[in-house]
């Protein structure tokens, strides 16, 4: 049965020649089990869809092992023959997905198959028709197990069903389709453990406003759509709810003059958007499931809106739940990377910015080899200097180290013009003037003795004969100014014998 499910439709397949399921693929599983035969209408419908694959009977015979393994490139679309669903099928096929289209009646899917066959895709490996699978699935009447079999191993489920606008007199239409059928699909998707569920509802499902609230005149359709949203949120499945604006009047060319706007829930109560733009948004959500994880978005189109990527607009919408961490894929035989040893960052910024480093003080030059031999005085000074000039660790510098020239503390050694004028130093008297003063006949010996006592040093020690020659200036001004010298008292003459 699984081989027959994957085989292309043919009137005479090699292993199922004459089988009713091969000749009449559009018959449902329930009809085949009753032994229903093929009609001329069913065979004529095959001429319009020779390349489509039908999984109506094969889905029921799928093994549990095939259900447990989900295929990320396989999408199940409920309402694939509708305005949004048919465009979503084509958009998914353009992006490289395989689509399993769930329809009520396979006869009505012929136009969908023809539109898919006319697509032009970049991938020449498989034709667009080979990526489409038609499966009959009535969400209102079939049991949950049949719906799970129809979903199969699809990883993504898209629900774009809704009550028909033509049956406006059907009072129970919004309840049966917008709520009950959607709820049945949600429960089946939960049982099938799909990875993402995309639900298309409408503006105003959670906010009362004009003109969206006028849709509730159609037998409370917004209230039932809100009940379907609550059922999906409470199921625990990863979901994305799309609330588009009015899609009745805009055509596919609407996107050429109106840019798509993706907003947070309960932002708009009115607006227009085309079916094609909503289908492109659904395909973008399926391609970026982690970005659209558990989000409720509203979609309208405006002429004044900027043209922004849909992925960026989805990323700005807050999520209802935190997405799970991505699993780490570790290949067999792959050695773990070695930890990178990070060098310590220096505290000084001068290592990175050399131009900011302040100028260093000039280093003293070592003495040349032709320097004169140090005297005993220099050796003693060097010994005391070695004790004072110790390093930061307290180790004294040995005498054997070369004597370094100390930097002078005064700036006058480099800048002579800043040096203040020095006070005039008195010139020492000559030896002739000192001898004339001491040999003057007018000076009595007592005055000379008193002068010697007065001309003493600061500590009271009388000046000796050797120190008298080194005396700088006499204390008496009479040596220079004779006219100021007072008259000396007459010296008595010695008596003559």
Curated annotation (Swiss-Prot):
Residues 370-387, 430-458 have a biased composition (Low complexity). Pfam families: NAD_binding_10. It is found in: Plastid, Chloroplast inner membrane; Plastid, Chloroplast stroma; Plastid, Chloroplast thylakoid. Residues 388-408, 459-476 have a biased composition (Polar residues). Residues 1-55 form a transit peptide. GO terms for biological process: protein transport. Its main location: plastid. Keywords: Chloroplast, Membrane, NAD, NADP, Plastid, Plastid inner membrane, Protein transport, Repeat, Thylakoid, Transit peptide, Transport. It is a peripheral membrane protein. Residues 310-497 are annotated as: Disordered. NADP(+) binds at residues 75-104. Residues 359-369, 487-497 have a biased composition (Pro residues). GO terms for cellular component: chloroplast inner membrane; chloroplast stroma; chloroplast thylakoid membrane protein complex. Sequence repeats lie at residues 346-367, 408-429, 474-495. Residues 346-495 are annotated as: 3 X 22 AA approximate repeats. Part of the Tic complex. Interacts with TIC110 and TIC55. Interacts with LFNR1 and LFNR2. Component of high molecular weight thylakoid LFNRs-containing protein complexes containing LIR1, LFNR1, LFNR2, TIC62 and TROL proteins. Involved in protein precursor import into chloroplasts. Part of the redox regulon consisting of TIC32, TIC 55 and TIC62. Acts as a membrane anchor of LFNR1 and LFNR2. Has a NADPH-dependent dehydrogenase activity, but only after preincubation with lipids. PANTHER family: PROTEIN TIC 62, CHLOROPLASTIC. This is Protein TIC 62, chloroplastic.
């Amino acid at each position: 049965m699984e081989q027959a499910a994957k085989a292309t439709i043919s009137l005479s397949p090699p292993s199922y020649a004459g089988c009713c399921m091969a000749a009449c693929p559009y018959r449902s599983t329930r009809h085949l089990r009753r032994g229903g035969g093929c009609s001329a209408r069913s065979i004529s419908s095959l001429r319009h869809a020779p390349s489509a694959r039908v999984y109506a009977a094969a889905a029921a015979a799928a093994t549990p092992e095939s259900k447990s393994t989900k295929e990320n490139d396989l999408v199940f679309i409920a309402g694939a023959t509708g305005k949004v669903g048919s465009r979503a099928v084509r958009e998914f096929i353009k992006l490289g997905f395989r689509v399993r289209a769930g329809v009520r009646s396979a006869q009505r899917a012929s136009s969908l198959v023809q539109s898919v066959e006319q697509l032009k895709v970049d991938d020449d490996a498989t034709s667009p028709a080979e990526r489409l699978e038609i499966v009959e699935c009535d969400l209102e009447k079939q049991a949950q197990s049949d719906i799970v079999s129809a979903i199969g191993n699809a990883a993504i489920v898209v629900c774009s069903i809704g009550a028909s606008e033509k049956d406006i007199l059907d009072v129970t239409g919004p309840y049966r389709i917008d709520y009950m059928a959607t709820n049945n699909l949600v429960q089946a998707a939960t049982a099938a453990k799909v990875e993402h569920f995309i639900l298309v509802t409408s503006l105003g499902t959670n906010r009362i406003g004009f003109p969206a609230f006028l849709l509730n005149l159609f037998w409370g359709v917004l209230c039932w759509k809100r009940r379907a949203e609550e059922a999906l949120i409470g199921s625990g499945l990863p979901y994305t709810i799309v609330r588009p604006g009015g899609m009745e009047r805009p055509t596919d060319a609407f996107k050429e003059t109106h840019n798509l706007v993706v907003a947070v829930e309960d932002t708009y109560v009115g607006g227009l958007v085309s079916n094609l733009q909503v289908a492109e948004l659904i395909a973008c959500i399926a391609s970026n499931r982690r970005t659209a994880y558990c989000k409720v978005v509203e979609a309208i189109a405006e002429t004044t809106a900027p043209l922004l990527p849909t992925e960026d607009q989805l990323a700005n919408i807050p999520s209802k739940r935190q997405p799970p961490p991505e699993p780490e894929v570790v290949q067999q035989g792959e050695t773990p990377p070695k930890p990178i040893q990070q060098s310590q960052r220096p505290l000084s910024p001068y290592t990175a910015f050399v131009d900011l480093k302040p100028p260093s003080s000039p280093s003293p030059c070592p003495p040349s080899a032709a320097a004169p031999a140090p005297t005993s005085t220099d050796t003693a000074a060097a010994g005391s200097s070695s004790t004072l000039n110790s390093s930061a660790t307290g180790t004294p510098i040995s005498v054997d180290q070369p004597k370094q020239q100390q930097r002078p503390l005064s700036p006058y050694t480099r800048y002579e013009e800043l040096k203040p004028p020095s006070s005039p130093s008195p010139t020492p008297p000559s030896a002739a003037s000192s001898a004339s003063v001491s040999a003057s006949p007018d000076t009595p010996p007592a005055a000379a003795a008193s002068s010697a006592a007065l001309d003493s040093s600061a500590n009271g020690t009388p000046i000796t004969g050797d120190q008298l020659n080194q005396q700088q200036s006499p204390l008496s001004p009479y040596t220079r100014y004779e006219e100021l010298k007072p008259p000396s008292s007459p010296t008595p003459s010695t008596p003559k014998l």
